[in-house]
Amino acid sequence: MGVGLCGRGIVAKPRLYEVASDLGTDSKTLMGILREMGEFVKSPSSALEPPVVRKLAKAFAEKYPDKVEEKKEHTPPAPVVETPKAPPPLPRPIIRHAVRGVPSGAPRPGNNPYAPRQGMGQLATPGPATKRPVKFKAEGDKKPASTHRRVPAPLPQKRTPLRGRGAPGAFGRGNKPKSRKSKTLKRQEFEMRDAPVIGGVTIPRGDGRVIRLMQGASVTDFAEKIDVLPANLLSVLFHLGEMATATESLDEATFEILAEEIGYKVQIVSPDDEDRALLESFSVNLAAEHAEDSELDLAIRPPVVTIMGHVDHGKTLLLDTIRNTNTLAEESGGITQHIGAYQVSVGDRFVTFIDTPGHEAFTAMRARGAKVTDIAVLVVAADDGIMPQTIEALDHARSADVPIVVAVNKIDKEGANPAKIRQQMTEFDVIPEEYGGDVMFIDISAKTGQGVDALLEAILLTADAALELRANPDRTARGVTIEAKLDAGRGAVATVLVQSGTLRVGDRVVTGCAYGRVRAMVDENGLPVESAPPSRPVRVQGLSSVPKAGDSFIVVAEDRQARQIAEKREANERNAQLAKSRKRVSLEDFTRAIQEGRVQSLNMIIKGDVSGAVEALEESLSKLDVGEEVSLRIIHRGVGAITESDVNLATVDNAVVIGFNVRPDRKARDRAAREGVDVRFYSVIYDAIEDIEKSLKGLLKPELEERKLGLAIVKEVFHSSRVGTIAGCSVESGSITRNAKARLIRDGVVVVNDLTVTSLRRFKDDVTEVKSGFECGVGLGSCDDIRIGDEIETIQIVEKPRA
């Protein structure tokens, strides 16, 4: 029995009914044992892995030892009994002599068509002619089965050293030589023998090996890394309660659960490393290019200064004072909602300024501004002091490892206290120079212009003292996209900051998922420029789509190369987005949620004028916390006007369209009115966040509140064949109303709940309500267990809106 199982398991995967036949039982019994072991099979025809077969045989022997013994007792002994009866007629010396005495001219054994046993291992004796046929044929005709069973005898098999004509059965008729297994096959068999069995499949254990995967990788990608079939990994995921397909993008948490189950460790490659590997596959190595620059190639470049701080502390007004413009009046709500990049002249030198939003929703924008800057100017209002976004901007500047200059603004206002600002900043390890530190504090008034020249001088002094600002202007351009938008007449327009090299009109560029040839470049004043050296911000036209703020841009040699890089980035970003939006749902939770209808979601489409504002709005909405019952799904986001395709998508997915500083075209407006799509427009970001939060709370199921209506004491109990048990009551408080919900209370304990006042009478009249101080007869439907002294409490369930 055991040999049959092991032998069959190694050669192929046996069916369940075959294993049941070997064990002498039925398939139903084995299916029950497999269910207890945690292995689930669909039918008796299901194939089993060898380790599962071994565990099943062991479990069956432990559970049904009597059947195993009975199987052993009824095993037929025929092969064991008949085998020793064959040897007596053919003594061993004669066989040995026959092998040696075959003449060279004799016909080859096995080729005689009249021989009764061609290919057998026994030979005729080489005695006289009269003896040989009689003796050989008599034995051969008598017991052919016995002589056939003597074939595996050890002596004839060992005495066959001659290859050509020694042993019968040559030319493929006898015993074939055993092929030696390769080391790889032996190692695989050994690994599979010790491999764990999960969900009915066998997967080699990883023993802690680290597997690197890209964001948004699929089960197929993981399977290729560890050299197993994707179907096996899907079986393991299903065993763990996860539903997925072979090509579906999974999140990091799902990969960690899967890898831990089979003995691996998963490391998700960061987006920067992933993009670096992508560029290197196209022979673009940014680090190597910077290393190749010699000292003679480097030239001095202007410093890049980012103005940061809390909202309404005067950052944009300060920049307007420096530039002699009025940017603040153009921003909705009086707050900056875009990143602005400008270059101004200070004497005979240039300084590039980047203005970042101060509102809390624009954290990502401030982080990007800190990464591309050389110096951070931290604006703090002298009357407000340090605020939350002030601390956040300080953290961004420190994480970017850039020097800081503190501008204490609004010193012209009443109640301004610059000394207090300096003392508060020391609590965050920002020590002014007058206190013995290394940070310059400049008192300014952006409104009157007081101290602005001193601030510019402090910026240049910091740049000369702490930084070595040089770049190679003679190579292909590299930089970063500061902001991007979709212009009605110009198409996709991106504000880029050149960090090295020189960007020229006609260059082939790729930034994020957008690519194209630079058709035109203009500066911050709208004047056309032909080239942009390092630290120069320009607006670029000619891109295929709107890139995201913060995307790096590079110049490549061919249009085809730019398109391939952009398409590959778009595919990676799509996979990462799918993995991010995928919610891990167990089988039980998924089924239960559908049955109970607990899943509610608000689908949204966000369109904005610039990509940075769309990103900030999306990030702020994702942080809204309104409980687990309601989810927010952003099914599409983009830059530009609201189009008819956006309305069509909202119609299909029952979504709300949010327009941030954009409007729908005529077709989209008509389609939205016809389909009843909710389209909302905002120009200030926190207005949008507040309205959407209220909408999400409106999706929440109202809280149910129980209100007490009245209490009655049972004085008498009457029984009626028509209406059942009737309680004669005295109303103690409130009122008793017909059809009201009620509960029966006895000695302070609720005896019966969820009752209804089915009948209510006062004397012989049916009434709808009996107030406190009066007596009445109360019927509680089929409830008959009513005793004198019980209390009947009526209640009302009301819906209470969520706070």
From Swiss-Prot:
User: Where do the record's region annotations for G1 lie?
Assistant: 309-316
Q: Basic residues composition bias: which ranges?
A: 175-185
Specify where it is mainly localized: cytoplasm
Q: Cite a single GO MF annotation.
A: GTPase activity
NCBIfam families attached to this UniProt entry? IF-2, small_GTP
Chain's role: One of the essential components for the initiation of protein synthesis. Protects formylmethionyl-tRNA from spontaneous hydrolysis and promotes its binding to the 30S ribosomal subunits. Also involved in the hydrolysis of GTP during the formation of the 70S ribosomal complex.
Query: Under what name is this protein listed?
Result: Translation initiation factor IF-2
Name of encoding gene: infB
